[in-house]
Amino acid sequence: DASDTATDVFTYTVSDGMTSDTATLTITITGVNDAPVAVNDTDAVNEDATVTQSSGSSLLMADDTDADDDDSFTVTQIAVTGGSNSAVSSGSSYNSSGTQVTGTYGTLTVGADGTYTYVADQSAADDLDVSDTATDSFTYTISDGDATDTATLIFTVTGVNDAPVADNETGAVNEDATLTVSDGTSDLLHGDTDADGSASLTISAIRTGAEGASGTAGSIGSGLTGTYGTLTVAADGTYTYVADQSAADDLDASDTATDVFTYTVSDG
């Protein structure tokens, strides 16, 4: 350890050709501080989740070493790989005065004691399809009080299924007519989205009434009677609405009324 000493003793003999004498050579070796050795770490998290390491073999310093047995070391700096270092407060833990840095896919909070938590940012990782992966890389620095070493902490972020987003649609028809929508520019799925680019959307349910209200459930591919007509919806979002003139007879010329249905879109 630093300032410890040890001796290496040698015996030598001198001679004048007739007689000889023996003496010793003692070399005192003084220890100096050995730098700690930081080891690269990895962890994994889903795009919509949080991973926390607060004890044991998963701490940042669990595999780090120092040849000086009596040395203890702490995390002193953290950075996004390739970015500027941020100081980690002495005596901190991830949930008490920890230092926070934001990476590509989430936010990492680190304590001087090697504890950390990583909160994935789902909006940043929305482009990941289910089971696709991406990495978020950070560097951390440890110190034994005199010397330092730096290693990486890499998170593998795995994509999960993102729910589709349905967009409200409108149509118009005269009271004695039929509206048929059979193209992809105005059907029910037009404007609906899914962050998982490979997802295939379908209509999975239909009912009368507005979203959040009660109504009568129908079946995909079968007619569902509303207030002023009958709606038939296919799974691919195409639909036909047949106005019921008898139900709309009270409407004067150019008067309008609405018939509202709620549909559910699914990505499977």
Residue ranges of each PLM-predicted region?
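Acidic/polar, solvent-exposed loop/turn segments
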Residues: D1-G268
